[in-house]
UniProtKB/Swiss-Prot annotation:
Example of a GO MF term: [protein-PII] uridylyltransferase activity
HAMAP family: PII_uridylyl_transf
Domains as described in the record: Has four distinct domains: an N-terminal nucleotidyltransferase (NT) domain responsible for UTase activity, a central HD domain that encodes UR activity, and two C-terminal ACT domains that seem to have a role in glutamine sensing.
Species this chain originates from: Yersinia pestis
Name of the protein this chain belongs to: Bifunctional uridylyltransferase/uridylyl-removing enzyme
Entry-linked CDD domains: ACT_ACR-UUR-like_2, ACT_UUR-like_1, HDc, NT_GlnE_GlnD_like
UniProt region (Uridylyl-removing), positions on chain: 352-710
Domain HD: 470-592
Residue intervals of the ACT domain: 711-793, 819-893
Cofactor(s) needed by this chain: Mg(2+)
GO biological process: regulation of nitrogen utilization
Length: 893
């Protein structure tokens, strides 16, 4: 059921007329064998291939045609350079070329094989032949070895051994080639068990490089999990162990069913088609579907739709196909393991109950037809897996039965009452995600259970923010939530580990995570649509109204805490009150912060840092305090100012400071300054201001990380260009600003605080402190900072995205402030450009919250005009226009 889907590109029937294939090189005269003529004819052949592909000729036909063309070219050159007269030599295709698979930019790997070492004159002729091929711009990899050298080097190197196993004679001494074949398929050359084990380890290491999933948004068609290499691995093992040279021969040996062979052939054909198209788009060899190539490839494959729809359709097909390859690869390698290694051949299975048994640590069916007769037994198997920690996976023949039953389901599993009870029992059990939901996803049982899941399987998110498809991201959210029950997670997520045991029903959090992105790709607000699905699902599964509404609220508001913490002024009591009013209870707050942290971490490994952690902690505790105080009771801001001052004073008295001088400094500061700084920060500022020459600006760089970044404090005469000067200089030093608090005292002195990070997201390196401090001093001292923001080109990735600039003025009751939400394409020097616009318009900035989400920036600025009042409608219009004119990407960037 869950594997039935349409590959958009494969449904096309195109039959336009194409030109005839150019003549093969075997017909070339000796006078034709020089570079310009050969290059002209090779180019004609390559143009014919592109034309044929565009006209609907299959990739299989064209790949074989290219291999055949190169065979004829090499045979002709072998004769031209006189090797047909050299005894006991052969030209052998190895690797992908040995399999007869050449894409437009594929490497052409050849072996010049000889009985005895070639003499100098013969070696020189080989060099001339290879040089000619290079001059034709063919990517040729070659080796020149005697038979003995081949065997010795093959024994020492798995890659060389694998290439030799795939070898194919192009021309030359047949007996010599067969002699090599006899040796490499003997028991002394990489015995089958040793070769199998080495290839499994090699595949595991390769998968690790891609985080164990093909669902990265820029996958490698060849090497990602579920890609062509996973099919090659099956063929290599079968070739070495059985001598099978094709998937059909694997059926003859009883290790593939006809259906599995057809599925692998279909998968290989699809992956070949995408790879062939990619090679036509590129000029240099690569197999990665990078963002800037995806649209061109999708269009070449005739995917249709508006905007990024062709890419989304193509990538959805790709991800679904690689899922099938991965499942078959794992199942068949397990079957090979039993056949080749036979480690557990004599071990009797241990009964688990009347339906299942344990083979080693793998669960196995006792009745091979059980899943077809009783589909709910599929859920009974996963319930056993979550309850029994001895079970580490599913036995290969049971996977085969599961795949068969899955395809013959007449309705979703959730329509069966017993299956629903089992599903909820799984969710309520510790380890539900890793031991049940994850394997259910890997084997498409989640899709078979709940139809909504099928719509997000392979659903990509065309941005730089999300690293995975929607289904893979959701599974990672679930795994992250499960990790909060583990004490080992405490150092990285102390708050969530502390709160998790206090969640009355953790299964409701898992349900919310399962549905939080379920409506992505449907159009409309995915949070609202997903909440509707969640309520229906919860009620269908017997949850009461309170439980159903909690799950729906978490789905509807799963972005609320992240948006509030990162894009709102959480030191504003009104923001905390508004957020608290939505949350309503401490219990809902605990659920929400757990879902929020898991969602951020599972979106992109590089997204979570101590800066985001500090913001969420601050919002959590401020909201908790507000909820305990009661929604009707606003915080006493005067009391908080007094409290901060007294605590800072107590710290300063330990240094025997001049209190009279301190009070002169503090008397010039406004209440906001004391509200928005901790007592430690107030004491740090005062300590240095008391010792500082008041005729010069002061720049302080904190030695301790603040909110995961480095705090920079600036005291200087205020002027409109000050912010632009500071952020411009920080940008020139490759520092990113994440937060800015801007204060102007009653005497016109600015007291500004910036939180900055290095490009890798870490606090400012200690050895850079004096350099940055000195650079900022110089920038501030210039009477009118005119250093233009750096103009740098957008990276190729960023250039591929379109984020129109939006200037949204948020509603507020504050008549003295304007809240500007700026959304724009992330680009070098953005904040410096924005600061210059503020300065040009004579605006004063009071705070800034900087948020980068993939290719987008979503920043919050609190502004006032020169009279310290909110911006007029006319000023807001001018500001919005200036921002759009300056920040919308163009060719100059």
């Amino acid at each position: 059921m869950s594997d039935n889907h349409t590959e958009h590109s494969l449904s096309l029937t195109l039959t336009p007329t194409i030109s005839e294939q150019p003549a093969l090189p075997s017909t070339y005269l000796d006078s034709d064998i020089h570079c310009p003529i050969l290059k002209q004819r090779l180019d004609a052949f390559q143009r014919w291939q592109a034309e044929a592909f565009n006209s609907g000729t299959s990739a299989e036909v064209l790949i074989a045609a290219r291999s055949d063309y190169i065979d004829h070219l090499l045979q002709r050159l072998w004769t031209f350079y006189g090797f047909d007269k050299v005894p006991e030599t052969a030209l052998v295709a190895v690797g992908g070329y040995g399999r007869g698979e050449l894409h437009p930019l594929s490497d052409i790997d050849v072996l010049v094989l000889s009985k005895q070492r070639l003499n100098d004159e013969q070696a020189q002729r080989v060099g001339q032949l290879i040089t000619l091929l290079w001059d034709l711009k063919l990517e040729v990899g070659h080796s020149v070895r005697t038979l003995e050298e081949c065997l010795l080097e093959g024994l020492a190197d798995l890659t060389i051994a694998t290439n030799m196993i795939e070898s194919r004679l192009i021309c030359g001494d047949v007996a010599l080639f067969l002699q090599m074949q006899k040796h490499i398929f003997s028991d002394s050359f990489w015995p089958s068990p040793q070769f199998f084990h080495a290839k499994v380890v090699e595949q595991q290491e390769r998968h690790k490089r891609y985080h164990g999933t093909s669902y990265n948004l820029e996958p490698d068609i060849k090497s990602s999990p579920g890609g062509l290499r996973d099919i090659h691995t099956l063929l290599w093992v079968a070739r070495r162990h059985f001598g099978a040279t094709s998937l059909s021969e694997m059926v003859d040996f009883g290790f593939l069913t006809n259906a599995e062979r057809n599925e692998l052939n279909e998968s290989q054909s699809f992956l070949w088609r995408i790879r062939f198209a990619l090679h036509l788009v590129l000029t240099r060899y690569d197999n990665r579907l990078l963002f800037d190539r995806q649209l061109s490839v999708a269009q070449l494959l005739r995917y249709e739709g508006e905007g990024n729809e062709p890419v989304e359709h193509m990538m959805k097909d790709f991800y679904r196909m690689t899922r099938r390859v991965s499942e078959l690869n794992n199942m068949l390698l397990q079957l090979f393991d039993e056949a080749i290694l036979a480690l557990d051949a004599n071990e009797k299975p241990r009964p688990l109950d009347e339906e299942f048994q344990l083979r080693g640590d793998l669960i196995d069916l006792r009745d091979e037809n059980l899943f077809v007769r009783q589909p709910e037994a599929i859920m009974r198997m996963f319930y056993l897996m979550v309850r029994n920690q001895d079970i580490k996976g599913i036995y290969s023949t049971t996977v085969r039965r599961l795949r068969h039953a899955r395809r013959h389901l007449k309705a979703p599993l959730c329509h069966i009452p017993e299956a629903r009870k089992l599903f909820m029992a799984i969710l309520r059990h510790p380890g539900a995600v890793s031991r049940a939901l994850l394997p259910m996803h890997r084997h498409s049982v989640l899709w078979a259970y709940m139809p909504q899941w099928g719509s997000i399987v392979g659903q990509m998110q065309f941005d730089l923010f999300h690293a995975y498809t929607v289904d893979e991201h959701t599974i990672r959210v679930l795994l992250k939530i499960e990790s909060f029950a583990d004490e080992d997670t405490r150092p990285r997520h102390p708050l969530c580990v502390e709160l998790y045991p206090r969640l009355p029903q953790p299964e409701l959090l898992l349900l919310a995570a399962l549905f939080h992105d379920i409506a992505k790709g449907r159009g409309g607000d995915h949070s609202i649509l997903g909440a509707h699905d969640a309520v229906e699902f919860a009620e269908q599964h017997g949850l009461n109204s309170r439980e159903s509404q909690l799950v729906a609220w978490l789905v509807r508001c799963h972005l609320l805490m992240s948006v509030t913490a990162q894009r709102r002024d959480i030191q504003d009591p009104a923001v905390i009150q508004q957020f608290s009013a939505e949350v309503q209870s401490e219990t809902r707050l605990r659920y929400l912060v757990s879902l929020t942290v898991a969602d951020i971490c599972a979106t992109n490994e590089n997204l979570w840092n101590s800066w985001k952690q500090s913001l969420l902690r601050e919002l959590y505790f401020a909201t908790e305090k507000q909820l305990r105080r009661g929604m009707q009771n606003s915080p006493d801001l005067r009391e908080r100012v007094r409290h901060h001052r007294l605590q800072a004073l107590a710290l300063l008295r330990m240094d025997n400071i001049d209190e009279e001088a301190l009070h002169r400094i503090w008397s010039r500061c406004r209440a906001d300054y004391f509200l928005r700084h901790s007592p430690n920060q107030l004491a740090w500022h005062a300590r240095h201001l008391l010792e500082h020459d008041s005729t010069k600006p002061l720049v302080l760089v904190s030695r301790q990380a603040t909110r995961g970044g480095t705090e920079i404090f600036i005291w200087s005469p205020d002027r409109p260009s000050l912010f632009a000067a500071v952020v411009g200089e920080l940008d020139r030093r490759n520092l990113s600003v994440h937060d800015a608090q801007i204060f102007t005292n009653r005497d016109g002195m600015a007291m500004d605080t910036f939180i900055v990070l290095e490009p890798d997201g870490s606090p400012l390196a200690q050895d850079r402190h004096p350099i940055i401090s000195h650079a900022l001093q110089q920038a501030i001292n210039r009477s009118d900072y005119q250093h233009p923001p750096r103009v740098r080109r957008l990276s190729p990735k960023l250039r591929h995205f379109s984020v129109p600039t939006e200037a949204n003025f948020l509603p507020t009751h504050n008549e003295r402030r304007t809240y500007l939400e700026l959304i724009a394409l992330d680009q070098p020097g953005l904040l410096a450009r924005v600061g210059k616009i503020f300065a040009d318009l004579g605006l004063s900035l009071h705070s800034a919250r900087i948020t980068t989400i993939g290719e987008r920036v979503e920043d919050l600025f609190v502004l006032a005009d020169k009279d310290r009042r909110a911006l007029s409608l006319e000023t807001r219009r001018e500001l919005a226009q200036r921002l759009a004119d300056t920040l919308n990407p163009n060719d100059k960037l």
